[in-house]
UniProtKB/Swiss-Prot annotation:
Family indicated by similarity: Belongs to the 4-hydroxy-2-oxovalerate aldolase family.
Name of the protein in question: 4-hydroxy-2-oxovalerate aldolase
UniProt-listed NCBIfam families: 4OH_2_O_val_ald, PRK08195.1
Any one Gene Ontology molecular-function term assigned to this protein's record: manganese ion binding
Enzyme class: lyase
S-S bonds: none
Site note Transition state stabilizer, residues: 15
Residues binding Mn(2+): 16, 196, 198
Catalysis: reaction(s): (S)-4-hydroxy-2-oxopentanoate = acetaldehyde + pyruvate
EC number(s) on file: 4.1.3.39
Keywords: Aromatic hydrocarbons catabolism, Lyase, Manganese, Metal-binding
Lineage of the organism: Bacteria, Pseudomonadati, Thermomicrobiota, Thermomicrobia, Thermomicrobiales
Gene Ontology terms: biological process: catabolic process; L-leucine biosynthetic process
Source species of the chain: Thermomicrobium roseum (strain ATCC 27502 / DSM 5159 / P-2)
Binding site for substrate: 15-16, 169, 196, 287
Length: 356
C-alpha cells in the first residue's frame, strides 16, 4: 500500500450545502457552524451562495441573507480557519471578489467546466494580484479522460492556481475513475491536487479515499453530507476515516460528529440520500439542475424523465444547456413512435408550448 499523507480538508457546508438549503442560511447559522468547524480543527471553510459569488439571482435562486454578510460573519467567528469563497467566471466579477476580500476571505476557488479552463486566466490573475490563495475547480470531470483533464489543469497552474481539483459534480465517478484522474494530475502538475465528491451513487467517501490513496493533497466535505443532489462526503466521516488510517490532519472527530448532529441536522430541510432522482443524476452523469426541467417535459409527453436524463448524459450536456431537454424528449418520442410502426412522429402541440 502507498504511504498516505494527511490531506487538507475544506468544509463546504456553507457553500455546497447552500443548494440543499435553497440559499437560506442565516447569520446565526453561519456563526454556529463556523465556530464548531473552527473548534474542531477544520482549516478552510467555504462560504458563499451555492453558485458562488454573485450567484444570488433569479436564475440560480436568491439568498435570504447577502453572501457578503455571511462571509463577514464567518471571518469574524473563525479564530484559526481560513474563509474561502467560490467564484465562477461569467457570474462573479472583480467587484464581488474585492468585496469578499474586504469581508475576510483568504482563499478563492475558481470553477469552470472541465473543458473550459482557458476562461479562468483573468480570474486567477486578479486573485493572485489581490493576495489570495487560489484553487481551481474542473467541474463535471467524469466527462473527459484523465489526460485531457491534466491538460486543463496545467492551464490553471500556468494562470496561477495553487491547487487544482477534480470535481465529480454529478456524483458519477467510480473509484477507479477517481484514481486515474487524480494520478494524471499528480503526474503532470507541480502544484497540489484536490478532489470534491458527490454522493449520487453512494460513493462519496469511497471516492474521497481513492483520491487520497492516489496522493490528493486536498479534499472537501460537508457536515452531515449537506449538499447538492445526494450531498457530499460528510466531513465528520472523512475525519473518522482519516483517523482510522492514521493520517488525521488535526481534526477532532467527536466535535465534528456533534456539529453534524446538533447544529446542522436540526436546520436541514431534508437529509440528502441517493434516492431515485439522485441515483438517476449520477447514473446519467448530468447536473442535478436538469432534473426538474426533465420531469416537466417528460410529463407533457408521457415519457420517463430518466430516459431523458440518460440521453442528456450520453450527449454530454452541461449546465446552461437545459434547452436540449425538449429536443431530447422529441427525439425519444419519435423513436418510440417509429418503433411502434407509427412512422415519422409529428411534434405534439405541447412542444410548441414548451418552446415558448
Amino acid at each position: 500500500m502507498k504511504t498516505l499523507t494527511p490531506p487538507r480538508v475544506t468544509d463546504t457546508t456553507l457553500r455546497d450545502g447552500s443548494h440543499a438549503m435553497r440559499h437560506q442560511f442565516t447569520r446565526e447559522q453561519v456563526r454556529a457552524i463556523v465556530a464548531a468547524l473552527d473548534e474542531a480543527g477544520v482549516p478552510v471553510i467555504e462560504v458563499t451562495h451555492g453558485d458562488g459569488l454573485a450567484g444570488s439571482s433569479i436564475q440560480y435562486g436568491f439568498s435570504a441573507t447577502s453572501e457578503l454578510e455571511l462571509i463577514e460573519e464567518a471571518a469574524k467567528t473563525a479564530k484559526r480557519a481560513k474563509i474561502a469563497a467560490l467564484l465562477l467566471p461569467g457570474i462573479g466579477t472583480r467587484r464581488e471578489l474585492s468585496a469578499a476580500i474586504e469581508r475576510g476571505i483568504k482563499v478563492v476557488r475558481i470553477a469552470t467546466q472541465c473543458t473550459e479552463a482557458d476562461i479562468s486566466e483573468q480570474h486567477f490573475g486578479m486573485a493572485k494580484e489581490m493576495g489570495l490563495e487560489t484553487v481551481g475547480f474542473l467541474m463535471m470531470a467524469h466527462m473527459r479522460p484523465p489526460e485531457f483533464l491534466a491538460e486543463q489543469a496545467a492551464l490553471m497552474e500556468s494562470y496561477g492556481a495553487d491547487c487544482v481539483y477534480i470535481v465529480d459534480s454529478a456524483g458519477a465517478m467510480l473509484p477507479d475513475d477517481v484514481r486515474r484522474r487524480v494520478a494524471a494530475l499528480k503526474e503532470r502538475l507541480s502544484i497540489q491536487v484536490g478532489f470534491h465528491a458527490h454522493n449520487n451513487l453512494g460513493l462519496a467517501i469511497g471516492n474521497t479515499l481513492a483520491a487520497i490513496e492516489e496522493g490528493a493533497d486536498q479534499v472537501d466535505g460537508c457536515l452531515r453530507g449537506l449538499g447538492a443532489g445526494a450531498g457530499n462526503a460528510p466531513t465528520e466521516l472523512i475525519a473518522a476515516v482519516l483517523d482510522k488510517l492514521g493520517i488525521n490532519p488535526g481534526l477532532d472527530v467527536f466535535k465534528l460528529m456533534d456539529a453534524a448532529e446538533y447544529i446542522v441536522a436540526p436546520i436541514m430541510p431534508y437529509q440528502p440520500i441517493p434516492d431515485r432522482d439522485a441515483i438517476t443524476i449520477g447514473y446519467a452523469g448530468v447536473y442535478s439542475t436538469f432534473l426538474l426541467h426533465a420531469r416537466h417535459i417528460a410529463a407533457e409527453f408521457g415519457l420517463d424523465p430518466r430516459e431523458i436524463l440518460v440521453e442528456l448524459g450520453r450527449r454530454q450536456a452541461v449546465a446552461g444547456q437545459e434547452d436540449w431537454i425538449l429536443d431530447v424528449a422529441l427525439d425519444i418520442l419519435r423513436r418510440k413512435r417509429a418503433a411502434e410502426g407509427a412512422g415519422d412522429a409529428r411534434e405534439p402541440a405541447a412542444a410548441e408550448r414548451s418552446a415558448d
